Amino acid sequence: MGVFDIFKKGADMPKTAQQRKDESIKILKKEGVVVFESLPLRYDNSEVTPRSVDEIITRAICSFTAIMCACTIRDNGHLSEDEIAWAKDFLGDFYGDLSVKEKEVVEGRADINLAVNMGWKYESLWILLWALGIAKDIGEMDKICDCEFVMNVF
């Protein structure tokens, strides 16, 4: 089982946090990644809530919009009023689902550091699109995601 296979339909999630950790360590070692086995377990199954398709779609829309605004801020130093209006219009009812930092970016209040960091959300958006079955192959995670593909989805 791959690290993200729990999102695929029909995949069985290991029963315990320890089983998940052991499986992840096995995969990482197979890939030649140095592993610190002494790190504590992150979450027990009782603390994990799988997200619904609607929640994943909402997160993808919010992430995409924040990324577009962040890249504009990074490249131009700011968002114009028209660009802010576009973002809010594109989001529609999803505007209220933005995180605090996403809202800062979409409203044009982000500094260059936040904008650059927000641009890296492409990687998490890539995983969301894979979880939705839109991106068919996310690769080995050793390269930057296919940003053009991500943009064309929206």
Where on the chain are the PLM-derived regions?
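Extended, charge-rich alpha-helical interface modules
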Residues: 3-154
